[in-house]
């Protein structure tokens, strides 16, 4: 109560921030006439003046009023659009590193031009992040006109660009692109083998459009670059055949909240019997340690059949299983579920099962975007997630006032007993809207419901448009015309987000289509455009007279924010509009959160078929259920971040060290340090200083020196011959032999080849060890929760063991680099002139896959297939002099002996470097 009184007297934190911003707006407005009086050339020259002032040491904030006023004037001249005062406030909040919550239709795209221009003056680059390629290309072309007028360069990062095109786009002053592309380019840069192959520069300032979608909805799914592993896919088909006979509640139980399936005792016995009969379970019980793989496959097959539904969670297209994003309804081409789940779904659908992939590099959006020096974002719905955005990213949410008052009416939810009654009521509501000429947007939660409603409307002979993952290409066109009188549009959740629904239709989009039609003469184009423009006002007025855009929600989402996004499509810029959610007791949210009590109440009230409950109390109870889910999801994301922070710190160390190696022309000093560390480790393990010689493991020491350095070192003989040989003298004598042998090889290879070779081996072994470490970390994380049963803190155990694994990886890295370099011998065949860049590119991993929501169709490999990285160097393994084997990784099996002559399996020798 006391806090309420204080807020009433001094205003809320949001009110105080808006008041501060209004003072900036007053300064910008005072400069308007000054810049209006300038001609185009003088106005464009302001950029050079601003940069000169920055170079003299003037702070960036001092330029803000003038820079914003310049952008506003250029926008008026180039775009015919002048930023409103509330848009100036939004731009100021973005510059301050905050999240601006702005209602749909308030012009967020135009707002971003203000801080983007101001911060680009520093010359460090500004990234404007959108959710898909279409919006990135559209914004770069549309508002990019403002920046280009002012002499700034604008780049676009979308899928299917070459490295050269990406490098040029990142070199621009302002770069528009998708969150996935920015993240994948960061990972690719940290897998490059030459500084020239990197495309990004520093992560200076990012403005994220639809920031809630990117930083919250997609935060739990990491960006992953992976490569194929060798695994028998037949097991997925064999296990899939067995689970079809399992019965729910008898053989297994389902936890819908956790999306998990658990076998009962009867189910375990049945699984053991069926697996034994099919030859899968050869020995022991199902849950014996030796059969853990079978348990894993069985669980994933059950989840594929019971939890994951076709047309809701995925669709099958062209013989492939494509995941459907639960938040947007879009296909997530190129993304695959991990841990064998995607393979289980493929087996269920009878399509080709593709091998699982091994992670080569990964990062979450949480950790990627926290690397930017300054971060800001904008969205129409962030206030419900303000606590999480502040806790995890340190971003404050500021609610920006609307330019015009919101005239939308949000009706209370209607709740029916069955889904059949609900769908019938929805169809009747749509029919009524179309008859009175009111445009309707219907939001569904899945493609299945989307197409089911379309089927009902066809039966009722109601014309409509369908927008889901299958109509992704027509998305902008369908949304653009969703505001015409009587239009009915069915869309999965947030499909079409980023494109405004204009009452009367988007005449600009229609004009663009006419201009792009090559079959029309110029005179016909002009006539049609004039007709469109003259007819639009009548359509606009008719749509308003009918009540504006009517939003129908077919069920509540787990998150209130997603529901608010749907509501927010109506009532843009002061237009009228209405919204209504239709629910049934069969809906997932209602079913999970206590629909039994509500069902009993409806029966006691004697409600007939087709009657609905409509009361604010019921709506409030549903919102309370949503808050519970949101709280649980926040806890999950926070916990995931705590685990990922451990890997993130290790990633930072590895990438920092890797970049230092790659930027250096000469890593010989680092190689010498590694050699010293390895020798010290060998001596500490076999002949530790301070321990009597009688207790030294001399055979082990000699074997280790032979294995690592390829040298026959007679340590025992030395000690026999020189009783006074100290530990330090012994180490010095061994090192002399090692350095002498290496110097002899270097004299044959030449200094230049040796330096290049050291760098190449160091980077390749580092990548190989990091890849294996990521897999080990995944395995550790999967089972770490079981430590809780032993009264141990899983997070602390994860941190402790991951550090042990990380240090062990570094030890293995040192030994493998030194061993590889020490055991190489120069071929007597003269080496031809070498193309080191081509050699470096050939060493990169091949057949990569990039996975995350909304990532465009399976990306092509980064490099063409090439021979083994070491081929052509004139370098071979230690072997008989004069014999140089032909090395071809395409013909050597991973478990066959390596042709270099080392005696190791190919996958543990040169194949490991791929």
Curated annotation (Swiss-Prot):
**Which family is this protein grouped under?**
Belongs to the SecA family.
- NCBIfam families with a match to the protein in the record: PRK12904.1, secA
EC numbers for this chain: 7.4.2.8
Recite the UniProt keywords alphabetically: ATP-binding, Cell inner membrane, Cell membrane, Cytoplasm, Membrane, Metal-binding, Nucleotide-binding, Protein transport, Translocase, Translocation, Transport, Zinc
- The residues that hold Zn(2+) are 898, 900, 909-910
An example Gene Ontology molecular-function term: protein-exporting ATPase activity
- Provide the topology term for how it sits in the membrane: Peripheral membrane protein
Q: Which GO terms describe its cellular component?
A: cell envelope Sec protein transport complex; cytosol; plasma membrane
Entry protein name: Protein translocase subunit SecA
User: Mind telling me which SMART domains this protein's record contains?
Assistant: SecA_DEAD, SecA_PP_bind
Co-factor(s) = Zn(2+)
Its localization reads: Cell inner membrane; Cytoplasm
Q: Which gene encodes it?
A: secA
Catalytic reactions on record: ATP + H2O + cellular proteinSide 1 = ADP + phosphate + cellular proteinSide 2
